[in-house]
Amino acid sequence: MAELLMKAKLTFMIVVGGVLQGLGMSLFLFPHDIPTGGAAGIAVLLHYLFQIPHGFSVWAVNVSMLFTALKWLEMRTFTGTLASITVTSVSVLIFDAVFPDITSNLWLDLASGAVLLGLGIGLLYKYKISNGGFGALALMISIYRGGNPGTILLIMNCIIFMVTASIIDWGIVIQALICQVISTRVIDFIYNIRLTSLPYLTPMYRHKK
């Protein structure tokens, strides 16, 4: 019974974290082509160039990276991350369809989107679930090398949104930087809050042979 309750709690956290990310990206950041780094940054670029829906791109890029890292991940970690990716991507697709182009204030949207993004990712990290391919890498580096995962994610994301901005518009670089700084602070804040732990959710990674 106790294990069932813990699994239910984990599922709830994955859904909440994924929906928060999808809400922040779809309603506040993607309408302004603000790259959030990682798969979402690539999704912005693909939508700009080929009009591919953000949700599909976010899912495809993240899952591709996740399968690439499969040999380092235990199946439990892999399935949890896959679930969070799917919830986020579906949320983006739903919010894009239900609330198309409802935003107008760039800086208010930027702040709102960054906070929601940070809350979603931070909540997933807190329960040892990655938010995607880049998130899995940041979490692994944090575990094995030390440091806050949000800061590590910031460094990797900077590379992605610099490439994206060079193609779309260099003006979004400042917006992306501000988004990353805000969301990183929120991620680290949530990650370091003492919450009820789930004992069986210790991150599982395979040792190199």
From Swiss-Prot:
Pfam families assigned: YitT_membrane
Sequence intervals crossing the membrane: 10-30, 41-61, 82-102, 105-125, 154-174
Localization annotation: Cell membrane
Entry membrane topology: Multi-pass membrane protein
Main location: membrane
InterPro entries linked: UPF0750_membrane, YitT
One cellular-component annotation, GO: plasma membrane
Source domain of life: Bacteria
UniProt entry keywords in alphabetical sequence: Cell membrane, Membrane, Transmembrane, Transmembrane helix
Family, as annotated: Belongs to the UPF0750 family.
Protein name: UPF0750 membrane protein YitE
